[in-house]
Amino acid sequence: MQEKMTIMQVLPALHSGGVERGTLEIARALVAAGHRSIVVSNGGQLVEQLKHEGSEHITLPVHRKSLSSLFQIRPFRRLLAEIRPDIVHARSRIPAWITVMSLRCMSPAMRPHLITTVHGMYSVSPYSAVMTRGEVVIAVSETVRSYILQNYPRCDPARIQVIHRGVAPEEFPFLHQPSADWLERWQQTYPQLAGKQVLCLPGRITRLKGHETFFALVAELKAKGLPVHGLIVGGVEEKKRPYLAELEGRIRALRLDADITFTGLRSDIREVFTQCQLVLSLSTQPETFGRTVLEALNLGVAVVGWDQGGVGEILAACHPQGAVAMGDTVALAQTAHAALVTRRRGDPVTCFRLDDMCRETLEVYARVIGGR
């Protein structure tokens, strides 16, 4: 029987986001397997959920991207000496620096193992290089692994392990249908979608998401006689309001006022996806993973996206007919048109499962501890 492990995950805060979601998923898996799960962060809206699911939370200001964070080295080192975790799993750069500096001042007998996860393709710098300092460096996709090898040659390839993010099929079940109440509210809120083939572009309102390409696609499909409507699902930060106004101006210029809808941030993305005939991924830069693409495919919704980054990896494995060479807008329109005309849904997804992600991560923990 495996001995009980004490694992401490460290990240800036517990607000919404992919890093935070992954932290909670691993914490939940640790508790379910009978291990002690501790998370250190500056707090946030997900703390109560974390604690309710059986983990411990310790509040420490490990979030500030400034020299003031160095003042957290001593209290964090005291915390490590008191708890004596087997592993510290750093999930972001400032927490990783605080951890590395704390471990330097500890005796080898007291020092926990360090694991890092590279969640994104950070700006290449000595500051970011700290994420390659783990005994094991977890990359969330092959794309991230390539980024590490290309930009940080001092990182031994043998220390890098790819563990793809995953989706729980019970959370995004194949051919899921929303409740009658939800459908009634949806139809009342968005009557303009009735009788339309809905194209969805999920993601926050930023210049990287490919909105202008999306508008052009909607215009072209409409010109070909398809009854399409574009749905942009994602929140907008206050500082991005000028960009939103720019997008709205572009919509007017293309005479798509009645053909594009912004929903804002939605907490019911599963239900929203079921009302879409096609989900698009058109980011101008490679995504590190592409979770929304995987969620849509799990539901059986067809996806079309640029064949790059983590999205390209997912499409290659689960829905290759939806992959389009980056920037080829002619092929994009042809692929989207074919998907809408044939009305072919995606096939059940059998890879990129949450259970696999959790199992592989816990196996890394056990292997690192066992190699002592």
Residue ranges and their predicted role:
Residues G17-R28, Q197, L201-E220, P242:
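A conserved mid-protein helix/loop that constitutes part of the nucleotide-sugar donor-binding site
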Residues V39, A302-G305:
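Short hydrophobic beta-strand element within catalytic cores of glycosyltransferases
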Residues Q45-K51, H229-D257:
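Short, structured helix-loop element that forms part of the nucleotide-activated donor/catalytic region
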Residues A90-A96, V118:
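Short His-centered aromatic/hydrophobic patch
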Residues P108-E142, P153-R154:
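A conserved, positively charged/aromatic
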Residues K239-L244, D257-R266, V272, A323:
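Active-site donor-binding acidic/aromatic loop of nucleotide-activated sugar
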Residues T274-T288, V301:
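Acidic donor-binding loop of glycosyltransferase active sites
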Residues A317-V330, H337-V341:
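Conserved acidic donor-binding segment of nucleotide-sugar-dependent glycosyltransferases
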